[in-house]
Amino acid sequence: MKPISIIGVPMDLGQTRRGVDMGPSAMRYAGVIERLERLHYDIEDLGDIPIGKAERLHEQGDSRLRNLKAVAEANEKLAAAVDQVVQRGRFPLVLGGDHSIAIGTLAGVAKHYERLGVIWYDAHGDVNTAETSPSGNIHGMPLAASLGFGHPALTQIGGYSPKIKPEHVVLIGVRSLDEGEKKFIREKGIKIYTMHEVDRLGMTRVMEETIAYLKERTDGVHLSLDLDGLDPSDAPGVGTPVIGGLTYRESHLAMEMLAEAQIITSAEFVEVNPILDERNKTASVAVALMGSLFGEKLM
């Protein structure tokens, strides 16, 4: 059992809705530390990465990317913190914050692996670039940036690019893609299980295939779990909810199967927004899923 280091990233600059910066606090309040300590893990909480201020329009220069400078700076700090955690032989567990923070997490983790795999558990593909993004929100770009596509301020975080390869990525739970993203996923040959596949195959088979696929090709796997991957009835407190999502039960099963397979080497849970939530339900769901990921069982 690897010791776990928790890093909070109160980032809300990768999108426009207020409140997601309170996600790390909400998950701590929902008892993440106590839950993992009950499973006999050695836990340290490294506190939060400092986040700069939102940029005014005139400060953005010619960039279509909202808050590019502040997002890049925070991700550089996060990459350095995660790098340190991995160097110390600990498991980095990152609490978001919007999904733009995955750029920093992956930058810190990937340098320690030859072939890092990624499970992207999300309603969205997050493979936009400045050219394809309808919004200019960086939380829709972290996977593209980590694959080496997009603005150099994002792709070069941690001082190297790319962090990961398309054939080492599996997308699960996707049900909302922009046109440019569909083209990107097809062209790069990224393995994807949309909700259509999840419904047809069932979650057990999706996870069995995902685990077998990554075990064969990678030497470590990062889990990037966006709470909007779940259906809004189970996880209402997210900034970009999409109906028809993964259930709590399916997600719980997915985490249990990952725990049994023992392939996950780092993880982040993102997009918990307490302002949009109902009585901290979404943060509690996130913490319950972390419990399952780290081996919590009913019996």
From Swiss-Prot:
It comes from the Bacteria. Its cofactor is Mn(2+). GO terms for cellular component: cytoplasm. GO terms for biological process: arginine catabolic process to ornithine; urea cycle. InterPro entries: Arginase (IPR014033), Ureohydrolase (IPR006035), Ureohydrolase_dom_sf (IPR023696), Ureohydrolase_Mn_BS (IPR020855). Mn(2+) 1 binds at residues 99, 122, 126, 226. Belongs to the arginase family. PANTHER family: ARGINASE. This is Arginase.
